[in-house]
Amino acid sequence: MVTRKGVAGFTILLALCVIVFGAYVRLTDAGLGCPDWPGCYGFVTVPQTAEDYLSVEQNFPGEIVDEGKAWREMIHRYIASLLGFLILLMFLKDFFSYRNNDGSLKDLKFSSALLALVIF
């Protein structure tokens, strides 16, 4: 059984990881390693094959793919996305707990505020 404290604790730890890794991405000047979002040069991951690089040249003229920077940026995006999903999970857990009279309104308000921050 996944407890609220366990999810909240892991979410806090992951938020710290996103902050630290975001600083690393920024300090290594990898923030534009993947210029488009949510993918990377039109791909789910960093372009890897010769065909991928041809597609990048056609769709992003003048862009040079730096795999190291691109991977750092994509990993940061993946970690941040996981954080968003954990906040959504926390909200859903609090919502259904409150609905079944097992949870508190305070917990639901807190997770609702976090979810609103992520969405907006």
Tell me what each language-model feature is.
Residues M1-V2, F96-L108:
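Membrane-interface helix-boundary motifs at transmembrane edges
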